[in-house]
Structures are given as C-alpha cells and as structure tokens.
Regions:
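ABC-type nucleotide-binding domain
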Residues: 4-239
Length: 239
C-alpha cells in the first residue's frame, strides 16, 4: 500500500497474532494504524480483513471489529460510567464495572466521590494521564472487538500507573489480533512479528530474537533503548 507517508508497505497479520510497529517518529507507524480504521485510505493498494477490502465494509461494521487505545486518552466531561459506555451504549452497569475491573481501574473508582457516577472534570475531579488511559482501556475491554490497535498506549503513564496499564493491556489483548505501536521496546519482545518502519518503508521485520541476530536497525534501537533505561535507573538510584 502507498500513501503520502508510506511507500510500498506490505504485511500480513494472522488472527490472534500480536504485531508491533516500531521505528523513528515520522516513519509511518501511526499512518498505517489509522488506515486500518479508515481514518483515510491508501492512495494505492488495499487493506484486507480476511479476504475483504475494508473499503467494501460499512464503516459501522468496521468500527465494531476494531478497538483503539491512542496516545492521547480522550475522556469527555461526563461520568466514568458514561465515558466507558461510549464503546457499547447498551451495556448494563454491571458490564461497565467488570470492564473497569479488568482494566485495573478499581483504585481509581474507590477514590472518586461518587464512584463510577463521578463526573470527570467537574468539581475539581481530574485524573492523571495514566489513570485516563486505564479508563480508555476499559472502553476497549467493554467493546471486546477482535482487532486491537495500541498507539503508544503507555506514553503518558506515570511510574505509579505504568505497571497497572501494562497489566490492563495484557488482559485486554487476550485472544485478539493486536497491532501495537511503541517506543518502549520492552513491551513488544513477545510480539509474533516486529515491523521496523523507516521513511515510510518496512526496513526490517521478524520476531525479537531474529531481529537481534540480524544486528541491524532494530538491534541498534534496542541497544539505545537499553542504555537509556539503564541511565534512568542509575539516575533514580542516585537521587
């Protein structure tokens, strides 16, 4: 497929697989993810779900098949219940509660004055970036679509929330086809296939072990990531 940001990109993800898209900013990762949701279509080529071109699938049907957790969690000024129920308007209250529990949101709900009926953004009630992400994950849990797209899903998670976000994502991903975009390379070592995008093209692909053995772009990315992580740990210890 081709677009203004992608050039001759071809990949195949089997049902139930976890695929990771990595690479420098501007490499085409988010563009590719948004094409799957038909935020826009490729100028050339096509995207298939099964054997069906997604342009031939009604948008409502396509949206039923895909859930997203994006970089910027978007919560509306409404109750937690209403924010989560956006993904499935007919959901019962008990379903929403179960989704929140699966998304590791119990601690959030317990501290809110009116529990899941608390209006976010009203009367000084605000959530941190990581807490908002967990509410967004609860939406995806409730929707339970077979395809899951995670775009920098832990980007705004503070240290206290990162472990909970990771656990929530692991629960959410069970039994689904997952397409994950991440800079935190430690989160994608278990991916069935990792695609390294650079300048709108797939520069390398393979599983973690195979890419490390190639000693190419991904290996350099991993070394840089590991060194940065070690520096952060050392800095925190000294502090």
């Amino acid at each position: 497929m081709c677009s203004s940001d992608l050039n001759d990109v071809s990949l195949s993800i089997a049902p139930g697989q976890k695929a990771a898209l990595v690479g420098p900013s501007g490499g085409g990762k988010t563009t590719l993810a948004k094409m799957i949701a038909r935020f826009f279509d490729p100028q050339e080529g096509r995207i298939l779900i099964g054997n069906t071109d997604i342009r031939n699938i009604p948008k409502e049907t396509l949206m039923d098949k895909v859930s997203f957790v994006f970089q910027e969690s978007r919560l509306i000024k409404a109750s937690v219940l209403e924010n989560v129920r956006m993904a499935k308007p007919q959901a019962m209250r008990e379903e929403v509660i179960r989704a929140l529990e699966a998304a590791q949101c119990t601690d959030i709900i317990e501290k809110l004055p009116d529990g899941i009926d608390t209006v976010i953004g009203a009367k000084g009630v605000y959530l941190s970036g990581g807490e908002q992400q967990r509410i967004t994950i609860a939406r995806a849990v409730l929707k339970n679509a077979p395809i899951l797209i995670l775009d920098e899903a832990t980007a705004f998670a503070d240290p206290d929330n990162e472990a909970r976000v990771g656990k929530a994502l692991a629960e959410l991903s069970k039994g689904k086809t997952v397409i994950m975009i991440a800079h935190r390379l430690s989160s994608i070592t278990d991916a069935d296939c990792i695609y390294v995008l650079r300048d709108g093209e797939i520069a390398e692909s393979g599983d973690y072990d195979g890419l490390i053995r190639k000693n190419g772009i991904f290996t350099r990315m991993w070394k840089n990531y590991s060194e940065a992580a070690e520096w952060k740990i050392e800095k925190e210890v000294r502090a």
